[in-house]
């Protein structure tokens, strides 16, 4: 029996000028995803994906590296300006925004889209260290 050679579709380089940078900064990690205006993913990165483990993932430096990686990958698709949507209380919020700006992408607007409960579920108990 002859083996059939299956050809995988190569990732098509889109040429998109403007997009949205979604920064999800949790207490444990920071995820940066750059999408087009419709919400289709162009590039993403996270502190954990870059090799940071444990408590190092939650540092501002890890968030900066994740944002740089996502910005570089999105520039290959032609992204020149982004609107930033920040979600979560993590420590990597500001450093991720600065890293995107330093990578040469123009930031047109910054929105805080952190979900606020209208008295939903009970929050976790306070840590006693």
Swiss-Prot record:
GO terms for cellular component: ribonucleoprotein complex; ribosome. SUPFAM superfamilies: Translational machinery components. InterPro entries: Ribosomal_uS11 (IPR001971), Ribosomal_uS11_bac-type (IPR019981), Ribosomal_uS11_CS (IPR018102), Ribosomal_uS11_sf (IPR036967). GO terms for molecular function: rRNA binding; structural constituent of ribosome. Gene3D superfamilies: Ribosomal protein S11. One of its GO terms (biological process) is translation. Keywords: Ribonucleoprotein, Ribosomal protein, RNA-binding, rRNA-binding. Belongs to the universal ribosomal protein uS11 family. PANTHER family: 40S RIBOSOMAL PROTEIN S14/30S RIBOSOMAL PROTEIN S11. Part of the 30S ribosomal subunit. Interacts with proteins S7 and S18. Binds to IF-3. Located on the platform of the 30S subunit, it bridges several disparate RNA helices of the 16S rRNA. Forms part of the Shine-Dalgarno cleft in the 70S ribosome. This is Small ribosomal subunit protein uS11. The gene is rpsK.
């Amino acid at each position: 029996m002859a083996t059939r050679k299956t050809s995988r579709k190569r990732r098509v380089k889109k040429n998109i000028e403007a997009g949205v940078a979604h920064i999800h900064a949790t207490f444990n990690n920071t995820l940066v995803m750059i999408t087009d205006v419709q919400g289709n993913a162009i590039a993403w990165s996270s502190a954990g994906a870059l090799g940071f483990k444990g408590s190092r993932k939650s540092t501002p430096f890890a968030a900066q590296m994740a944002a740089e990686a996502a910005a570089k990958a999105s520039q290959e698709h032609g992204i020149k300006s982004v609107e930033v949507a920040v979600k979560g209380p993590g420590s990597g919020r500001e450093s991720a925004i600065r890293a995107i700006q330093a990578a040469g992408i123009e930031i047109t607007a910054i929105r805080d889209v952190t979900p606020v409960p209208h008295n939903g579920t009970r929050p976790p108990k306070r840590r006693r260290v």
